[in-house]
Amino acid sequence: MIELPALLATTITWMCRVAAVAASVNAIELLAMRHALFARGGWLPPPLAPQWGVWRLLLGARAFTGVLVAQIAFAAALAIAPGTTAGCIAAAVLAFITWLSALRFGGNVNGGSDAMLFTALGGLAVGQLPSVDSVVHEAGVLYVAAQLTLSYGRAGIVKARERSWWSGHALSAFLALPAYGVPTGLPRHMPNHRLLLRSASVGVIAFECLSPLAWLNPIACLVLIVLALGFHTAAAAVFGLNRFLLAWSAALPSLWYAVHRVA
């Protein structure tokens, strides 16, 4: 019999540590890219900068570099002090910085992965609030689990409605896009393996559409978590989507708590 209070504490600890890694990697990547972005004008304030309002004080070229350094520092605090008031503050600040980054770049260097990381960090901020009932902490974790499940379910439904996904053509098209940095050997050989592409596409659709079943049984939940980690690891290796791997990995422990909470 699993004790829910202990499981909740363990879940929050693991979510904090993985979310801290995700936030650190995001900041380090942007810092490493800033010279290349600056050369192309991407690091300078865009024409829509006046719409930033008061936040423009934090989003200028020099100021935002300091924000990213602060992101690494708060990520370290989140990893060191999970489940504490300091962890709560760190998660809240990191969620705010993630929002600032989305505002700063408007989706050009961030997207769904930052949205999931924002969700995980927001849930962790609630899950670590001091001097509140444990129900509030549970609500933060369960919210992340619900959003995680919805992200898979909605993606699966969208794919299931497209004939190109069932045939494997959509996956083949993604492999051929140069923007993802797909290993050079794959685009040459994969389009010839229609059965493999179709099988992989159907497998992804089934995995995403059946994700809500993870709430019904711990074994089903464990299977989904393993499949999810495999799916995101493969996507990171093939498409370079390491941010997705880290962001969703930060949220996946919430699903393990959810299935034990509702069972």
Task: Cite the ranges covered by each PLM segment.
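Alpha-helical membrane-anchoring segments
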Residues: 1-263
